[in-house]
C-alpha cells in the first residue's frame, strides 16, 4: 500500500495545495500532465497502486526521496528524475495503444486492455530473461550471468515476471556463443542441465555451440547424445548429416 501511495505523483505532478504542512494525501491535484486534474485523489492513489505493483518499485524510483521517508517529506512535484518523465510518456503510450486496439477490424475481445503489467510483469525493465542473461554473459562472463540467473530464479520463480523454462538458457547460450564467447555459452548449458536433466534439445544447442568453434568431433558427440535421449530428434539427425557424421 505504501509503495503505491508514494508513487501517486508519477503522472500528475501533484502538489500539496492549500494544505496544512505535512498533510497527506492532499485534497486536490494541480499541475497535472497526463491524468485529468478533476480526477479524485483516491482514484489516482488506486492507479498508482497498480503502477507500483506492475513495476515492482517504490516512491524513490520516480520521486525525490529516500526509502522509508515519510510521505509528507517526499518531493512529489519536482520533475527531477528521468524515470518520472519516462513514466509519463509510457502512460501516454499505453493510452494510445488502447485507443488503437479499439479500432482493430474484427476485434472480438472488446474488454482487452493493455496495462503496465502487460509488459513489465513486476519488473522495472521489461526484457526477456534470455536477453538479460546474454547481455551479462557477453559483457561480464558466464559466472556473473549465472549469479544473475540464480538470484532471479530464487526471487521470481513461480511468477510470470520471467520464463525459467528450458529454452531461456539454451537461447542465451546460443547468442552468447555467436558473440564469440563459446566457453561461457557452454557453462550456461551446463547450468541448464541441472534444471532439465535428460533434455534432448539442450544437446542440439550444445552441438551447435561447439560447431561455432569448429569442434566437429565434440559437436557430433553432442548430437548423438541428443538422439540417445530422443531418437526422433530431427534436428540432431540433420546436423549429423550436415557435418558428415550420419547416425
Residue ranges and their predicted role:
Residues 153, 157-160, 193, 227, ...:
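A conserved position within tetratricopeptide repeats
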